[in-house]
Amino acid sequence: GRVAEVAFARGLPTPAEMAGALGAVPGHLGMLVETGAIVARLLARGVRISTRTIVTRACGSDALTSVELTRVDAHWRPAGSPRVCAADTLVLGYGFSPSTELARQAGCELDWDSPRGGWVVRHDERMATTAEGIFVAGEPTGVAGADQSRAEGTLAGLAVAQELRPASALGDALARATRQVEAASRFSTVVQRVFEPDRAGLARLAEPETTVCRCELVTRGRLTDALQANPFLSTANAAKLECRSGMGPCQGRYCEGTVAAIVAAERDQPIRESGRFAAQ
């Protein structure tokens, strides 16, 4: 099939954002060149690339037939009339969510960090979590890419080895691993900041008939009705118990963030105050 359009919800990077990203370029030039080549190839084949544009509706009865796209402002609020693009396939992506279920069940404390994906496992400079004897690396610390995951894995492994054998001469190796994590983090932090989704903006786009939880077929309207009927319902987990959102096979992997954002909007509170689903 033919790609009709690639739409980005955010605008082009500002001069200040570009200047702030310069420190992340060393060591990652190849990745930037590859990205530029992909964009050039799309443009050469006539693919439209739009910025400040978001999908506001997918249309069709038994199958997708068209997509409605709308210009948005800096906070992802529709700022123009929608246009329709014929399509039989739609791919959406608004960031990644770290898998932290095992860490939660093990008693590790989490922190809310929206650019890194939402709820991430708290750890120290050696990748040790708040739960004794448990170290963490990769995705649970925040979605940061393969390079940082490998570097964190090396650092965590060395830290575990040193803890098991304190007399081991691992000082130099630990220092190198720490520098590798720091270098990878400089790049990932820029990418995370530039492409952080506007979670409140996404929640606003959901209409009453929009399916929020696909596993249990819970709509935005059903969730809103429950929140309005119960003024003391103020967390994502409470909404889960009330509406069954997040009780399906995926256990909230797809809907937890949306439910938390909707609860936050209805209760006029930060998304972090909505909490998270209990890990099962």
Regions found by a protein language model. Give the residues of each.
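Residues forming the flavin
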Residues: 1-243, 249, 253-262, 266-278
